[in-house]
Amino acid sequence: MNPTITEHDFRFPRRPAAPGRDPGSDSSDDPLPASLRELNSDRQSAFNDAQNKLARTEAFEDLRNGMARVKDTPELLQEQDPLAAQVWRFFSKTKTMLPNQERMENLTWRMMHVNLRKRQQEESARISSPPLKTNAPSGIAQQLRQTPTQKKSSAGEMSLDDFIDSSHGSATSGLASSSPEAGKPDSTSTNAISSAIPINKSRKNEVAAQSQFNPQSVPAAAQRGRMDNEFGYLKRHHRKTSIDDRKTTRKRPRGCSPFQVPSIVTDTLSNDLDADAGFNDYTLDSTNGINVSQPMTTNGRSPFTIDAFNVPSEPMIHSAGPYQQNFSFSPSTSPMASNGFPQHMFNGQSITNSLANPDLYSPPGSAYQSQVSTPHPMNENGDGSFFFGNGMDVRHQRSHSFRQPSATQNMQTQPFSYNGNGGGGFFPQSMASNGMSSSYATSGNTFGHIDPAQVFQNEQTAQSPGFNMMQENNAFNFGGHSDDEEDGGVFADRNLALSSEFSPGAMDEPAVDFGTNPMGWDATLPGNFSTQAARYPAGPPRRQNTIGGMPSEFGEKNGDYAEGGLARSQSQSFHGNQADARRRIPRNASTTAIPNSQMQYEQQGVQGHTNSPPADMANGHTSGFSSVVHSRPSSPPPGSKNGSTTNLQQQGNNQGGDAPTTCTNCATQTTPLWRRNPEGQPLCNACGLFLKLHGVVRPLSLKTDVIKKRNRGSGSNVPGATSGSRSKKGATSTAVSGTNTRKNSSLAISRTASTTNVQVAPTPAIAPAASQSRAGSANEGESPMSGGGNTAGSTPTSHNSGGSVAVGGKGVVPIAAAPPKNMPGPGAAAAARTVALGPKRQRRHSKPSPANASLIGMNNANHSDAMEVDSPENSTGSNEAATRPSGFGTTATSASFAGLTSNSFGMSASTRSMITPGMLGGGMSTSALSSTGGLLSSGSAAATVPQEWDWLTMSL
């Protein structure tokens, strides 16, 4: 008895359990419990009611025809929801008003049909695809199951490996053709069947097949197997390229030469391919690339009997070597060529002391003109210029067998990273024993590494050796520092690149003291004494001639660099009085003359590297010119400021980083168009065109000649005119505004009571009395201050008068020296011959003080053949000057160049003294001195007024 029934009070009627059922009959045949039956009955009744009421057509009579007659509905709906009624009305009205209602509907159905059709096709394709999968064995697997002969026929005529293998005879054609497939049949067929196919099995088969291949085809096969098997567990869907996949292993004929000639040598190309044995050494990694190189001979020559231009000993090529060191691959060996070039060609240890590669290759933070090019450390012996050991002198190609610098011996033993021999450096030491040019064989190789920070200091324009062709050693000494122009330029023959082999070993020794030699000019020496001294990583200093007992480029005995192969590293350490002597800064290839170079060294403590140019301690910075040509200004007197700037670019009165662009060849700063040499260094238009047209650097001698032709057209070229023109240039006005004056362009020499203080006042004051000396920057001392003083355009009123002379246009001076003026008698004032020189080029030619002018005139009078104002000797330092007698004896007392008196040179009026900027304390350019033609006569003691000498080369 069901408890629910018993508990129910029959007095109360119950709901019908189900439609058409009476309450009493439900329990008999309904399998559900009473409670569930009751719930079910309720649900059923609700369903029936909904069905009866909602299914009536009259309820939705208006909707029966697709809402075509909905016009009454909006009112009905509006009662309930006016907004909905409005929307409905709009919708229905729009629907009914569509002109192409049926067509729209048809289009909708058609679109739907297209979609459905696509879907149906996809479904059918999906359904049909499984049979393809099941038939996969008949695809690739079926081909794999074919007999070798069948495979051979079906392999395809384009399968190159089949021919290669059969011709090579390494395997039968059947094997060759099947080998790529050997592993795949199982993997592919089984993959089609099940994803659990053992990959190893296919791998084994593939490896077995590969073993039968030519080694050359193995690499591709191995890679192919690796690729296929790695993902072999994936089912391979039917592919159009399934057969091609079978042949991909043989699709690489490049490495499959039947001759088994290794196309490239690399052992790192593929890690696991035995075939790569053919590619023995291909690698961009220095680990293999450099080590692969042939063993280097101790002398650094190429292991082959070939003497490739003595490349191992070529400084230029060697300089490239250390840079290569950081390259991922050695440039000497092409990644594609095994052991191609002699490694030392580029790996020469000769530049053991080269800067770090990135430092050399990336322009320093302040890219000076010269620094733009890769600085190649110059050999300390001063011999190596970037191009062929010595400048562009190709004659220097042979190794310098004459002197085998001990430095080379030391270099071998030293553990430089680049030292191929002792240091175990990457690059074999190319200059081991072949007497390599001392340029890279520094005795002791004192600086194994140059601190790029030192080399590239913004204020110190270490001239990048890249343009060493301009360096002193160059066959053509192009516009060395203009102040030293006479040294190198005049004696161009000395500038010819004499390989260090010719330079006496003593020159490389730091102990050599040229101070004892008042002139310090040793004709036997190459144009630059310290061939390597000032060659900081940037390059050798321009002038190494010792002037007035001051070795311009030689390291001091007591200098920090005195010991070891840095003999010249302190290129211009001066042995003279450090206090008074105006030291010429050791010039890098590009450093401008800076006073007190020795003191700079001492103060700087060798700036960390002999190669790194010392910062100008006195002036606070070295010249800003980075052009290979040293910023021509000679070192200003120690006390003077670096105020003078070239008239051309007037970079502000500092020689520092803003120095005007200077032609690395001729040192000119005035040119209508700046060009660049292959090193990226600035060249004037003339030098650039010459180099472009002739392929060789333009000799300074040509420059001088050209200048004469161009600028001297208006003046008489009488020998005496030199005094006049010089007088004109060196008008008594000592004060020329420093801004207009070019560095080193003029030297203000004032003789004070006991010591001649070369002080140039930047102020444009009219020339002070003869006794008055200008206080000014050292540079100004070097360059005349344009101002009240006579300009080239104006003629000094009287050369002898100590009074100031009114001057014409300020600093307006033609590029060339003013046309020669009438030569005043020795005591006579220079004829006031005003040559109207167009201010075409603002050049401030220094005007000598009247007294000096008179002296000059006297000197010129005595020497009718005295140099013309801008004679090649004067401006460019042509060899003419060398021929001129230089009767120049400096008295010991006047040896100090801090004070430079006319008497200090002990020059007789008759003798034409060769005065170099170094003698004048670097304040005066040698050309200026020489141009004065015996700058000071013995009577010049009277000339107390500072004299400014501007020589053409300086400005140009």
UniProtKB/Swiss-Prot annotation:
Keywords: Activator, DNA-binding, Metal-binding, Nitrate assimilation, Nucleus, Transcription, Transcription regulation, Zinc, Zinc-finger. It is found in: Nucleus. Transmembrane segments: none annotated. Residues 42-51, 131-153, 167-194, 208-217, 588-613, 713-760, 849-863, 872-881 have a biased composition (Polar residues). SUPFAM superfamilies: Glucocorticoid receptor-like (DNA-binding domain). One of its GO terms (biological process) is positive regulation of transcription by RNA polymerase II. Pfam families: GATA, GATA_AreA. Major nitrogen regulatory protein; activates expression of nitrogen-regulated genes. This is Nitrogen regulatory protein NUT1.
